[in-house]
Amino acid sequence: MARNDIRPIIKLKSTAGTGYTYVTRKNKRNNPDRITLKKFDPIARKHVEFREER
């Protein structure tokens, strides 16, 4: 029970508009705001910003 409360599963969606997503977990205590990470988008074939989707 407690595992999913502290570190929920989130989707990171590409801002390039390709619709590609990464699935990961985040720590709500350390990062209460939405996460943005630069990761590789294989459809766009470049590194782009991925934002947390709620």
From Swiss-Prot:
NCBIfam families hit by this protein: PRK00595.1, rpmG_bact
Q: What biological processes does GO assign it?
A: translation
Protein name (record): Large ribosomal subunit protein bL33
Q: Does the keyword Ribonucleoprotein apply?
A: yes
Superkingdom per UniProt: Bacteria
**Molecular function terms from GO:** structural constituent of ribosome
Q: Which PANTHER family match?
A: 54S RIBOSOMAL PROTEIN L39, MITOCHONDRIAL, LARGE RIBOSOMAL SUBUNIT PROTEIN BL33M
Output the Gene Ontology cellular-component terms: cytosolic large ribosomal subunit
Its keywords, alphabetically, are: Ribonucleoprotein, Ribosomal protein
Q: Which family does it belong to?
A: Belongs to the bacterial ribosomal protein bL33 family.
